[in-house]
């Protein structure tokens, strides 16, 4: 009887581990405590356009969605908790089209995040909304900013891949942790 309980427990553990590894909903560990909210290099405006990553050397882009926001993703964008992009050509397109108009408003309940990791191991993060009618970012520094190239960004987000590991650790290794 004791042997059956051990075998059953082991099989249950293996099944749960398999689900955790392959379901597309990893555990996300983030380090917010050392976030520098005052990086003046991010806030330059060119002709009323705000692009906080235009001059950054980006290694990867990570989208972390709240469970509620996953249901609101537009058609074609993979409905998973974490999407990632590390393809250089796609990152370059993204940098060129990640342009926003600052509205001066505030979006109250933005729970999803976009996280940019640079080649210098700096981390840039801000809250993001991606749904059928909107792409926008929300930060303490600039408030709500609406995407100027939403259609192009939708196409880029459709090419992001599902993060397949069970844990995602977002921490600046020897770099800085900043809000966009």
Over which residues does each language-model region extend?
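Function-determining sites in protein domains
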Residues: 2-9, 16-180
């Amino acid at each position: 009887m004791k042997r059956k309980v051990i075998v059953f427990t082991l099989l249950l553990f293996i099944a749960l581990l398999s689900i955790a590894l392959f379901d597309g909903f990893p555990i996300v560990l983030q380090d917010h405590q050392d976030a520098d909210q005052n990086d003046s290099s991010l806030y330059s405006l060119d002709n009323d356009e705000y692009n906080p990553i235009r001059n950054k050397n980006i290694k990867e882009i990570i989208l972390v969605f709240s469970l509620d926001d996953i249901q609101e993703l537009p058609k074609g964008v993979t409905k998973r908790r974490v999407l990632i992009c590390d393809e250089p050509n796609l990152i370059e397109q993204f940098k060129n089209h990640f342009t926003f108009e600052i509205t001066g408003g505030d979006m109250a309940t933005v729970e999803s995040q976009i996280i940019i990791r640079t080649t210098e191991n700096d981390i840039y993060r801000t809250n993001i909304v991606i749904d059928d009618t909107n792409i926008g970012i929300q930060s303490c520094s600039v408030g709500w900013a609406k995407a100027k190239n939403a259609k192009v960004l939708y196409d880029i987000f459709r090419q992001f891949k599902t993060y397949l590991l069970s844990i995602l650790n977002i921490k600046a290794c020897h770099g800085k942790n900043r809000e966009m």
